């Protein structure tokens, strides 16, 4: 009888401890949620500034926010019409969340989904760096599947909307030392100065297998492939062609060049 009571008491104590612990864990998760959201926003702002060539490494959160607010303008783009839109608030709108909502996105036919993202949001957010009303840099969000993961990043274009000012990813799960070399500063530096379009205005940017021949007429559009990471390289090439194509920013860039965005 005594053993039975002891066992019951032990089980009750264990149950109470579990319940109390679960309450604390749930409470901590709720309490930390705003902080986690702020940190994600800060990381995103830091990435945008870096791609645009603004700021210095090691800036504090306050410095990042101040520089972002003073130099970067966020605007929402209607990808269907290729024009700026007031349909969404650029500060509160989340394109990635919208891409999962059938009411705010469209399913992509397999033949057109070269970036393997399945759905594309109808509105997205772009970022502009301007001086005295003149566009210096345009930052476009891009994403697509590599070998093991979806890569999320930004492509920065100079004011001519043809020359690459910066390119990089802020989130992915590619293999370190192979596909993970998309984070290598040397590889990212290869993109700066490359041009997206040829003399006829056709999209010509390309990641090639091996190294670019500097004497080639196509060298200005080409970037070295990642050694030992053919599928990641192909994935990056595909995602760029998707987002610069008709289902991405093609119409928007055309309108912006004409001053009609």
From Swiss-Prot:
Membrane-traversing stretches: 11-31
GO molecular function: FMN binding; oxidoreductase activity, acting on NAD(P)H, quinone or similar compound as acceptor
Enzyme Commission number(s): 7.2.1.1
GO CC, alphabetical: plasma membrane
Top-level taxon of origin: Bacteria
Signal peptide residue numbers: none
Cofactor(s) needed by this chain: FMN
Membrane topology: Single-pass membrane protein
HAMAP family in the cross-refs: NqrC
Assembly behavior: Composed of six subunits; NqrA, NqrB, NqrC, NqrD, NqrE and NqrF.
Descriptive protein name: Na(+)-translocating NADH-quinone reductase subunit C
Species for this entry: Pseudomonas aeruginosa (strain ATCC 15692 / DSM 22644 / CIP 104116 / JCM 14847 / LMG 12228 / 1C / PRS 101 / PAO1)
